[in-house]
Amino acid sequence: MVEKIDFVVAWVDGNDPVWRKKKAQYDGTINTSKEGMNSDKAYREWGTFKYWFRGVEKFAPWVNKVYLVTDNQKPSWLELNSDKLVLVDHTEIICNDYLPVFSANPIESNIHRIPGLSECFVFFNDDVYLTAPVEPTDFFSDDGLPKYVTALAPITTERYGTGHFQMNDMGIITTHFTREEILKNGKFFSIKQGVKGIAKSLLYRHSKFICGFWENHLTHPLLKSTMELVWEKEKDVLEKTSASRFRSPSDTNVWLFKYWQIASGQYAIGNPKLGGLFSLDNAGPDFWKLLNSRKYKVMCINDGFNVQNENQVMDDFIKAMNQLFPDKSSFEI
């Protein structure tokens, strides 16, 4: 049984005028349109972050510490005296020469530097919510290995998508692990991966090259020691990502460390039905019911690019979250 598991979440308030002024000093040549890799959409704050904390307290009361990583920001409702909360500034984990940064990639690549962080921790994006009770064994095996569900699957890239980062991640993985090692270590054909996962892997097992790993886009259980090892092996690449003020096609991202665990065989197979990825593009009455059904323990609820009647959808989202989490958490004033 793992003794301590911490949660780490990164957050930005894109509505903060001080932060916006700082960003404006650097983003003159950056494409911030809706279709761009550095779209302003990525920084929007709708007032839903408190529900992330309510989910943690309600459904994972066993968590050791919750580390909130920000750029000298904090939500107005945050209770700084909460016993489990630790506020972490970018200056504590990223070299000052690279700051400020307005991309998640350098932040996520340096979270292992958080002072006091436990060896076993779970990294969350702020749109990944706990929506039913979870146990430590949903994220780590009894002997401390992170749990993933994966499969062999090609990485698809779009001009402004994140597939570029995963391609770069896989380039590093295939430098350090042979095709044979990955197939041997990856556990892709275990029945625990689920029928769909095995079917994906069977399609690509005879490919000349390892084309990528399927990713469920939920939580990221990670080992601090693995991040340190990858940094030791690929310092120059990770320094380049750390210095990337805005998203760039040459970046790596946090999935690199998960990929390393898979390629080395240092992971345990998780529950294929743990959670799901959803977009507010398609939100409606059926989705709000699903959100409150507790069918999934973890839900990534993505603020989509093509949400119709955006303000109404966000109002409905907040109402649904209030039904699921009607009570304030100890993380709130």
From Swiss-Prot:
Origin: domain of life: Bacteria
Q: What is its EC number?
A: 2.7.-.-
Which keywords appear in this protein's UniProt record, sorted alphabetically? Exopolysaccharide synthesis, Transferase
Regions annotated as coiled coil: none
Q: Give the GO terms filed under biological process for this record.
A: polysaccharide biosynthetic process
The yes or no answer to whether the keyword Transferase is present is yes
Question: What Pfam family is a match for this entry?
Answer: Stealth_CR2
Its Gene Ontology molecular function terms? transferase activity, transferring phosphorus-containing groups
What general EC class does the enzyme of this chain belong to? transferase
Family, according to the entry, reads as follows: Belongs to the stealth family.
**Miscellaneous field:** The cell wall polysaccharides of some oral streptococci act as receptors for the lectin-like surface adhesins on other members of the oral biofilm community, especially type 2 fimbriated strains of Actinomyces naeslundii, allowing colonization of the human tooth surface. Recognition of these receptor polysaccharides (RPS) depends on the presence of a host-like motif, either GalNAc beta 1-3Gal (Gn) or Gal beta 1-3GalNAc (G), within the oligosaccharide repeating units of different RPS structural types. Stealth proteins are part of a protein family that is conserved from bacteria to higher eukaryotes. Family members were first identified in microbes as proteins that help pathogens to elude the host innate immune system. Microbial stealth proteins are involved in the biosynthesis of exopolysaccharides. Stealth proteins are predicted to function as hexose-1-phosphoryltransferases.
Protein task: Part of the type 2G receptor polysaccharide (RPS) biosynthesis locus. Essential for cell surface RPS production, and the host-like Gal beta 1-3GalNAc (G) motif of the RPS. Probably encodes a 1-3GalNAc alpha transferase.
* Name of the protein in question: Receptor polysaccharide phosphotransferase WefF
Which species expresses this protein natively?
Streptococcus mitis
